[in-house]
Amino acid sequence: MSHFSTIKTKLKNKPILQEALELLQYDVKQDQELKVTGAHGIGHETVEAELAIGTDIGFRLNEITGVYELVADLETWNQPIPVERLLDKVNQQYARMTIHNTVKKMGFQVEEEWEMDDNSIELTVTRWT
């Protein structure tokens, strides 16, 4: 029978997580009930997700740790990329958005940005005084 699996992340900021998902071309829906159906349509399981990117994939806040978790039905995963790659892409975009927001708050402006062969990101920032 299908069921939801929970994968821990280090993502804490909901607006940045939502922006990262949208930049990755996901249609993000807020406060959705995710649902999986058992074999042959018998039984089902539901879980609440603060940010959903499908009917059975989303992110929910762990109230104890204050960190978002990926919840998904890994048994019937039918995305174009493996779940590990999805998390890598989300983490990279989340980090990019966090850096952009931080440098902006510090009065800097991103002038150039490169994605390196190893998937790291390099930025050139400036600040006029």
Summary of predicted features, one role per range:
Residues M1-T129:
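Interaction-mediating elements
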